Amino acid sequence: KTPVFGMMERSEIENSKGEMEFMSYVHAMVVGNTKKDSLMPIISQFVEEGATVFTDELNAYNALGSMGYNHKVCDHGQLQFVVDGEVYTNNIEGFWSHFRRMITGCYHDVSDEHLQSYIDEAVYRWNTRKASQSERFSDMFNKSIGLIVTWSELKLCKVA
């Protein structure tokens, strides 16, 4: 099984009606393994020091507190899924559930060498889920101008 790592930013934003609305953004990627030495540099790259980080009980996350993060844990092994009403990992688990259904329902199976591309598609769909189809199309079109990806470049996307 190829390890995949994901992080989700949870925040509240003011919508067009002036109401506060929950929003979440995902970063996800194929990783070589789920050990501390692999995950901590990724977390440091995307998460500001001092931020509150909610995780499950994976040992690789134990160093987060000493790295300057406010680390809170849900220990699923102890059937702990919500702590103090705000510490939970349900949102990222919801993203993974959508990703698995996308693979099963649309693609049926994916190879390791193209897994990151499928993850990128799922992340894009999640992060733009509140946009209209025309806004999504326009955004994708604008981002693809000048972008040329050859088959041999795709074949280079191998898992480490």
Regions found by a protein language model. Give the residues of each.
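Residue-level recognition of single "structural anchor" positions
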Residues: K1-A160
